[in-house]
């Protein structure tokens, strides 16, 4: 089973303010630690993460792709969720451009 997540620049921030775009910075050491840890989970074959870093992004642009490959959905879904949450909470820092 292969599951993926594609992050897209939204037109509004979580608090509702309008956004014209953003830039993202990445802590590569933390990203490697998360991926290495989650790859050890039962049934997981591979995890790939690509993040557009230090480039101006506009509404609708892709920010990130996350792909988790594994044996069965019961193993893959939680790893995708944990990896995504960890990346968003500890790896990336977004600077939003408000309208």
Q: Where do the language-model regions lie?
A:
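N-terminal, polar/charged subdomain of small-to-medium soluble alpha/beta proteins
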Residues: 1-64, 69-99
